[in-house]
Amino acid sequence: NYRKFLNCLNYLKVNETLIPDEFLNISFYPDPYLYDWKIEKGEKIGIISYKSLFLANEIEVNEKLNLQLRRCGLSPKTLFISTLKDHIIQKKLIEIFKKEDIKLIITTTSFSSSQIKNNELIENSTNIFTSLKIPILQLLSSNRSRKNWLNSSIGMNSSDLLMQIIIPEFDGRITTCPSAFKEIISKKNTLYSEITSYKADQVG
């Protein structure tokens, strides 16, 4: 949708003509959105990612993950969601994963879906990570480049450590090694900014 918006601006700037209908049609994606589901053999693995990444076409990590799981004889079931704080979305995820008999969850989402009051967890039957009673792996995506990661002696920086390890542990998620790094894909002088994208790491 954002790409269509930019195309509209280009038409107005250059031609000042009517914008083609193809750029005016807005796509709608349900929440959660099922992505790249196939009928295939193998144990089913649930994958949860933010829908904002899908809308920004930031899906290389998900595609590489699906590919590797299929090479291992597994069946990935990817869902893009807006948030895990919404109990309605969590309920939908639980229904889908129970119906599909998901054996393991891999999530790229940050924060925590658990509610905390007075430093204690509040029991919630609709919490996806506690009600399904299956292992949950936290896939780590570093906000630094792989080169900076390798040259650093501290490992995860403070923001990655907080958002992807410390807070998600409230959900009982199992921490993994970094599977993606934020790399510069182009530099635009007109934007005065570097354009970055998460790139899947073959080792992770």
Model regions: which residues?
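An N-terminal assembly and electron-transfer interface module characteristic of large anaerobic redox
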Residues: 1-204
